Amino acid sequence: MSQAATPAADGKVKISIDPLTRVEGHLKIEVEVKDGKVVDAKCSGGMFRGFEQILRGRDPRDSSQIVQRICGVCPTAHCTASVMAQDDAFGVKVTTNGRITRNLIFGANYLQSHILHFYHLAALDYVKGPDVSPFVPRYANADLLTDRIKDGAKADATNTYGLNQYLKALEIRRICHEMVAMFGGRMPHVQGMVVGGATEIPTADKVAEYAARFKEVQKFVIEEYLPLIYTLGSVYTDLFETGIGWKNVIAFGVFPEDDDYKTFLLKPGVYIDGKDEEFDSKLVKEYVGHSFFDHSAPGGLHYSVGETNPNPDKPGAYSFVKAPRYKDKPCEVGPLARMWVQNPELSPVGQKLLKELYGIEAKKFRDLGDKAFSIMGRHVLVAEETWLTAVAVEKWLKQVQPGAETYVKSEIPDAAEGTGFTEAPRGALLHYLKIKDKKIENYQIVSATLWNANPRDDMGQRGPIEEALIGVPVPDIKNPVNVGRLVRSYDPULGCAVHVLHAETGEEHVVNID
């Protein structure tokens, strides 16, 4: 992992961090800094995936197992999208108990993923760990809680409060994995979700075991996670003004609440150019103008006719990530998008602490205004969505029917198409499946990472992370901590140590971005 800071004649300094993440490919971030702020940014995916090619010619039912290997953090999301695409193509309607069982599997994965995001991928940007590996070496000018809070005793107490939760969160995540495995067979890479529903018929004993584990997770979210996030935000108030971006969001909807998939816990929708719109799948296109891919015709392609033709030598390209657009506009996806579209009530803890710590009267999510689109706003909404998911899991546990059927048998059609729309913890996810002669003829995946971490499109518009980086403060080019904070607020699963090499002196600076 390396980072180079290169001076330029116009007073800019280019900082290149490569790779910035280990999950879902290698993410490279390049920013140009002038007068202590980012003035330009490029987000590059440096590894070709090619899962679409792997799936061609296979039994359609294989897809839900193969696509889970895309990501070890959210395989359940890819499985969900895949089986929904198969349900659509096979013409099968899942039973009520099958739908609820799927929600319980996926809901537990949501809880785990969100807790992972903050505590083990982002928290050490703010909380100081002990002076032992892997917490050291740490970079200078880290701007941690212990640096921000001037009262030494209060600083140490607040930092210890956060660090203790960091350790406890490991245990909570293990419990969430057990919850997934109880109905999903195992975690990661669940086996219990298939076309037609779920393979596990819940029993009263299993429901009780799941519920007992869930209570511990729910208690952690309410009593520890939410209070820590709001306490952290009260210290880093400037990060509620940083990383705003395009302010366009899109959500596909997740956790169906009826058997016809007409209502969802978090509904589909679009907020673009300051207006709410209904989601129309026909308006989704992928562009490759600055991606290492070729299209057979100019312009963007709808996912149903999508092409995956790699060209690593393409002039002007800088990423193996395509550029999805809605109405030709870049859109952010993830908890921010879902919560903005749904606009649910904030948790009682959140409403109370916003008033006590910030002096803000906020009942619903949109009451936060532009603060929601910031670095710290994203962390707040992830915590709030974790609470909202926990409330839903508690409801589903009351709805699930022990002993009731969860699976509907179906046959592979000779020819068919199907699309699965859902939401990974990181954001909007779709899988498109085309069957010919009972085999997969075409398979296309538009993942959350594509939506958020994409490069410029054919029109020259920056991707969401690229745009959000503009204006981010970088007072010390050797320690661009806010660049890492911004990218991590999108949950791209980071965990690396970065070295900065000064282009003129050759001096090396260790930059820990864990």
From Swiss-Prot:
Cofactor note: Binds 2 irons ions. Iron 1 has 3 cyanide and carbon monoxide ligands. Iron 2 has 3 water ligands. Binds 1 nickel ion per subunit.
Pfam families reported in the protein's UniProt record: NiFeSe_Hases (PF00374)
One Gene Ontology molecular-function label: ferredoxin hydrogenase activity
Highest taxon of source: Bacteria
Family designation: Belongs to the [NiFe]/[NiFeSe] hydrogenase large subunit family.
GO cellular component: periplasmic space
Keyword Ribosomal protein among record annotations: no
NCBIfam families to which the protein is assigned, alphabetical: H2_NiFeSe_large, NiFeSe_hydrog
Keyword Ribonucleoprotein: no
Residues annotated to bind Fe cation 1: C74, C496
Source organism (scientific name): Desulfomicrobium baculatum
UniProt entry keywords in alphabetical sequence: Iron, Metal-binding, Nickel, Oxidoreductase, Periplasm, Selenocysteine
Remarks, miscellaneous: Perhaps the leader of the small subunit serves as a transport vehicle for both subunits.
Catalysed transformations (reactions): H2 + A = AH2
UniProt cofactor(s): Fe cation; Ni(2+)
Protein name (Swiss-Prot/TrEMBL): Periplasmic [NiFeSe] hydrogenase large subunit
